[in-house]
Amino acid sequence: MKKHILFLGAPGAGKGTQAELISQSNSYLHLSTGELLRKEIEMNTALGIQVKDIMNRGELVSDELVLKIVRQNLVKDNKGWILDGYPRNLSQANSLNEVLNEINQPLELVFYLDIPEEVLIKRLLLRGRKDDTEETIRTRVDIYKKTTEPLIQYFKDLSLIEYIDADRDLKTISSDIKQKMA
């Protein structure tokens, strides 16, 4: 069974949902970078103070800082882990791969949750968030495509990627993922 897994997919594809379901059923660590950053801030750690300061200035948290927080969580005792929504670009993927090899926890599998754009837009509009207008959603999806397509190719070249049809019900998707993890 694969134990070091990454989930990729557009906003609203169901990465977080599937990552959480799979991590719970296997007692794996589920690492979502957004949650990790919030947790560091909440716990008022040295890294959290740095992150809070950067965010308060309206700046993006650097790749180096995010990677440091991810690494710190990966080296903790775990039966396995699932990364959700990170890396987001080639530079982050290369850095992450270096760290994973250093800590002897190489990436074993990448699930790409594939979903038609129109289905994705409908899903995101149904979430009912104030900032989720069709225009802003399409912009986010376009940005995602531009940055993620090279990432998908990168993992494809490493023979790590598995495509998952994310336009199905939750149980069917989870079952498909579990089969591919075996």
UniProtKB/Swiss-Prot annotation:
Pfam families: ADK. The keyword Cytoplasm applies. Disulfide bonds: none annotated. It is found in: Cytoplasm. GO terms for molecular function: adenylate kinase activity; ATP binding. Residues 126-132 are annotated as: LID. It is an enzyme of class 2 (transferase). InterPro entries: Adenylat/UMP-CMP_kin, Adenylat_kinase_CS, P-loop_NTPase. The keyword Transferase applies. CDD domains: ADK. Its EC number is 2.7.4.3. One of its GO terms (cellular component) is cytoplasm. Residues 32-61 are annotated as: NMP. Pathway: Purine metabolism; AMP biosynthesis via salvage pathway; AMP from ADP: step 1/1. Belongs to the adenylate kinase family. Monomer. Catalyzes the reversible transfer of the terminal phosphate group between ATP and AMP. Plays an important role in cellular energy homeostasis and in adenine nucleotide metabolism. Consists of three domains, a large central CORE domain and two small peripheral domains, NMPbind and LID, which undergo movements during catalysis. The LID domain closes over the site of phosphoryl transfer upon ATP binding. Assembling and dissambling the active center during each catalytic cycle provides an effective means to prevent ATP hydrolysis. This is Adenylate kinase. The lineage of its organism: Bacteria, Bacillati, Cyanobacteriota, Cyanophyceae, Synechococcales.
